[in-house]
Amino acid sequence: MATDGMVLHKRSLSEGGTSTQAWKVLSQTLPSRGPDVDAWWQLTGRHLAVLLDAAAYPIEKQYECLLYHYHYAAPYLGPAPREGASPPTWKSMLQLDGTPFEFSWKWNNPGGEPDVRFGLEPIGPMAGTSLDPLNHLAMREILYKLSSAVPGSDLTWTHHFLATLFDHDYAKYTQKAATMGSSIGTSLVYSLEFQRKSTGLKTYFHPRKLDQQAFLDIPSWEASFRGLHPNSPSRTAVHEFLSTNPEGKLLKPFCLSVDNCSPAKARIKWYFNSPHTNFRAIREIMTLGGRIADTETRTKQFSELFNLLKTVTEEHADFPETSEFPYVPNNGDSIIPNFADAPDMLKGCVYFFDIAPGRNLPAIKVYFPVRNHCRNDLAVTQNLNRWLESRGRGQYGAAFGRALETIADYRRLEDSGGLLSFLSCQFMEDGELDLTSYFNPQAFHSGRLTHRRATRRRGDDRW
């Protein structure tokens, strides 16, 4: 891997590289809140600390981010995984192994800095019961608290979609879950994105209508959108693509996210799953079937994206645009019960279309599932860093690699895949590729559970 190159930032990793000074200070001074909360804090709190340090956040911002986690993440992750424990009553669908937490690392452009984000599905004590069949109570509590804690927060759009993407007869949801023999499944997620001078709050909605099968149908989505904004040129363009284009007809809508800020500045991201990973399909979707004009800059961006995907998957230079990227069964994951009615969600690429009012055409991002198509986590990391370094963006590559090794302290990165889940790309107006790596802490990985020490005191470096 490339050298760090961060001459202005003195990193604060403790001896052995398993935590940072900020995390150790907070862990020693903040009060215990019970075994489950403490366990999640020791796991994901330490991971967050290492990522913030690797991304060279100022020390005061590191403390701020960790305190957000302490107050608004760790207490809401449900029962902590333990070796030999019964499976949790509510199993999150945020990750394949049931971990209700996700990290992302937005890669720096030349001369810039990375951004770190976390997302989670809050799990309340009554999740899946007749009192809270959709597991919404914890999320509503957190949003109420964060609306005061995050400057500039505005929940207007979140309130609208909470009211229109779900039914409100909890008794019928309880009956449906009993008929299914399992809980309804994940429907609300939130994320905090930590920029250097601000923090952004987003809400994600996975609709769960009573008459819904695997995916909510397009007319039901549109009914919700129309209640917010009757006319939207970007949304009209997406609908035309979905109904007339061969690739568009294959897309399945499964999620929506909104920025919880002033509606004048917020985005509405509509997420779809595609069964394809071939680059011709990626190009067709990211141009909206030719509706987004081809330019010299965009042509170069597509060439760069294809080169990047061939690099991380270790495919040869003349790999055809029409070929699906080969599937690599290396992560040990299988279809968990909550995905039984939507197995397509575990393969193919994911896209979002930003359909916020004021745009004639949507901004589009593709999420490539590296967990399915790359040899192992070390290969993904090394190949991505090599690509970034060759384009003057490798300043943080080595620090990112070391952070991943710390997070995966229960195994070696070269042993398997699955820690890194997606690599996303959005084309920027300046010609750069906006890239983000997403990863799963794998809290329920058998190796992590057996790796735990038999006894430990709160605040130790390792969970």
From Swiss-Prot:
> EC number(s) for this protein?
2.5.1.-
Signal sequence interval, chain numbering: none
Origin superkingdom: Eukaryota
The cross-references to InterPro entries, in alphabetical order and at most eight, read: Aro_prenylTrfase (IPR033964), Aro_prenylTrfase_DMATS (IPR017795), DMATS-type_fun (IPR012148)
- GO BP, one example? alkaloid metabolic process
What GO MF terms are annotated? prenyltransferase activity
Modulation of this protein's activity: Mn(2+) and Co(2+) strongly enhance prenylation activity.
Pathway it acts in?
Secondary metabolite biosynthesis
The chain's disulfide connectivity reads: none
Q: Name the Pfam families for this protein.
A: Trp_DMAT
Transmembrane domains' residue ranges: none
Tell me the null mutant phenotype.
Impairs the production of the xanthones variecoxanthone A, emericellin, shamixanthone and epishamixanthone; and accumulates several upstream metabolites, including emodin, chrysophanol and monodictyphenone.
Keywords (alphabetical) are:
Transferase
Q: Which PANTHER family match?
A: INDOLE PRENYLTRANSFERASE TDIB-RELATED (PTHR40627), PRENYLTRANSFERASE ASQH1-RELATED (PTHR40627:SF4)
Sum up the protein's function in the record's words.
Dehydrogenase involved in the conversion of monodictyphenone to the prenyl xanthones such as emericellin, shamixanthone and epishamixanthone. Monodictyphenone is first converted to variecoxanthone A via a paeciloxanthone intermediate by the consecutive actions of the FAD-dependent monooxygenase mdpD and the xanthone prenyltransferase xptB. Variecoxanthone A is further prenylated to emericellin by xptA before being reduced to shamixanthone and epishamixanthone by the dehydrogenase xptC.
Give the matching NCBIfam families.
arom_pren_DMATS
| Family assignment from sequence similarity | Belongs to the tryptophan dimethylallyltransferase family.
Q: What is this protein called?
A: Xanthone prenyltransferase B
Q: Which organism is it from?
A: Emericella nidulans (strain FGSC A4 / ATCC 38163 / CBS 112.46 / NRRL 194 / M139)
Lineage of origin: Eukaryota, Fungi, Dikarya, Ascomycota, Pezizomycotina
